[in-house]
Amino acid sequence: MGRMHAPGKGISQSALPYRRSVPTWLKLTADDVKEQIFKLGKKGLTPSQIGVMLRDSHGVAQVRFVTGKKILRIMKAMGLAPDLPEDLYYLIKKAVAMGKHLERNRKDKDSKFRLILVESRIHRLARYYKTKSVLPPNWKYESSTASALVA
């Protein structure tokens, strides 16, 4: 998929392994992986951070191949899912940081322009999540109250 506010086509991506079976050297069972997800989710880690942690320290390349479910679905079943989707959360966090920067540096025209681009991404993503019923239909992003969402 192409980029929204850049000329790049976004072709590079990581390749999933061809074999979808669990490697023979992996000693963790599906229940062990779910238990690790529960522990890491309790600490407040996001699904992508949990995936990186499981990959790097436990050797689980793809949680979905081991458990049959994605990390976020497992977290939802355990009641640990975040109220905001992860990509939207990080975009809002970026917009809040840019807003703080603009309060200190009023004449930074480029940052002001980039903030507009980030906020338009937030609005587009929010519209998508409203159609998918992930966000309530009356949810609205406002830059004045955004810092409370990511705090």
UniProtKB/Swiss-Prot annotation:
One of the record's GO cellular component terms: nucleolus
Biological process terms in GO annotation: translation
Residue runs in coiled coils: none
Keywords: Ribonucleoprotein, Ribosomal protein
Molecular function terms from GO: small ribosomal subunit rRNA binding; structural constituent of ribosome
InterPro entries membership: Ribosomal_uS15, Ribosomal_uS15_arc_euk, Ribosomal_uS15_N, uS15_NS1_RNA-bd_sf
Family label: Belongs to the universal ribosomal protein uS15 family.
NCBIfam families: PRK08561.1
Protein's recorded name: Small ribosomal subunit protein uS15
Organism the protein comes from: Plutella xylostella (Diamondback moth)
Taxonomic lineage from the root: Eukaryota, Metazoa, Ecdysozoa, Arthropoda, Hexapoda
Annotated gene: RpS13
